[in-house]
Amino acid sequence: MELIANLHLGFTTAFTGANLLYCLAGVFLGTLIGVLPGLGPTATIAMLLPITFTLPPISALIMLAGIYYGSQYGGSTTSILVNVPGEAASVVTTLDGYQMARQGRAGVALATAAIASFFAGTVATLFLALFAPPLAELALKFGPADYFSLMVLGLIAAVVLAQGSLLHAVGMVVLGLLLGLVGTDVNSGLERFTFGIPELADGVGFVVVAMGMFGLGEIIRNLENETLRSEIVTKIAGLMPTKEDWKRMLWPTLRGTVLGSALGILPGSGSILGSFAAYSIEKKISKNSAEFGKGAIEGVAAPESANNAGAQTSFIPLLTLGIPSNPVMALMIGAMIIQGIQPGPAVINEQPALFWGIIVSMWIGNFFLVILNLPLIGMWVRIIMVPYRFLFPAILVFCAIGVFSLKNVEFDIYFMALFGVLGYIFTKLDCEPAPMLLAFILGPLMEQYLRRAMLLSRGDPTVFFRRPISATLLTLALLALIVSCIPALYKKREEAFREEQ
């Protein structure tokens, strides 16, 4: 009964005219940036953060959430029609989706992706409604030492699940933690790492870093390597799957939904892991495994359901623990802090309308996405054909205006440009910026909880090992780090044996 009452509160909040409009705007923008390869939800949300200052908290968060899960829908469109994934989570969809399109079944492939995404998004949101409240209740029992250990685990998980070199990921985390230290120490009043620059006394702006690393950095990278989009499937007919198609897509959609919902909670790239894992499992157990890579409908249904389910459940750590599971969730935490909301388990009790309004808006948003993705497919095809060289200058101007509007300080524009160049350099060096952003968000919070824990324990560092929850979390972090190091150590051992021979 309590769940029904909470959902009623959520529907009452989400079904206001303004929130419906912002939900529609969010999923529309999400679909748009998903359709355009190179423009991801991270860059888009980073660019829109300044706008959230002027919006009510619930409306702003509903819109930003819609951009995130809406981009998963849009990413499948380019995967199927152009063989270019709009989102990283849609990479697997290209394998069979594009082949279906070349066989004249583009409409069926698009409908399959939309239906699987809608089902997965709806079910995953139900999981969020069921499991988020108990987890939030558990989190209320956490002390400062437990929160510190939880954040250590989150950073270690981000390192373990990051793409590329483990050493690079650790380096990016350290850089993020150092950036979080810049500014005035709230306890001593002394400036740290400001190098005599007055504009750094308040610290490095989160929006400046996010816009630079993910917005401007992506623009530079994509202008250097503009994707060739010559083979675009424009003839689309017969959207409805056949009876045989329905049979073949049913179980892959169900399995992808469950798998994606579970992996979406993991820090890092849960939705990406979910789509790859779902595709691999279906390829192994399917009766039609020989058709995979040649236009199997299971190869579209499974990854699309998995990545959309993962996008929904990635909100669980954010709404219950205040821990971001991916860069987009880190930006969502930034948006909440901008609105004066302290992310964490207290949100469900102190602002239940906000908590349940966001959850219910996801159901509404998934319904909007089905309407946007199928009837308007002709419009998305025309948008795909817009050259980047015309699109990105407008985005660059928008970034500069957005950053300047926060404080009316010209220095922030130069700083954004600096982080844009750094983001581009990091990409060229195969250093994923996501762990840096997570560490930049969590660093000041970790420092705060570390000081509280040491103050309450009178300077006794063993408090982190004496508390059961904290000790368990630190043990898990250590195990994750050890497991991630084993392959590298094994590889070096093999290389040493080869040199001896």
Q: For each predicted feature, which ranges?
A:
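Membrane-interface alpha-helices at helix entry/exit sites of multi-pass transporters
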Residues: 58-62, 99-116, 287-299, 330, ...
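Transmembrane alpha-helix interface/packing and boundary motifs in multi-pass membrane proteins
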Residues: 27-41, 71-83, 158-163, 257-267, ...
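Short, charged juxtamembrane terminal tails flanking transmembrane helices
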Residues: 293, 495-501
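Helix-loop-helix hairpins and the membrane-proximal interhelical loops
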Residues: 1-60, 133, 139-140, 191-296, ...
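Flexible loop linkers connecting adjacent transmembrane helices
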Residues: 47, 80-109, 134, 143, ...
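Short, non-helical or kinked segments that cap or interrupt transmembrane helices
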Residues: 35-45, 59, 80-93, 143-147, ...
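Alpha-helical transmembrane segments in multi-pass membrane proteins
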Residues: 22, 26, 30, 34, ...
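Membrane-embedded alpha-helical modules
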Residues: 111-227, 338-492
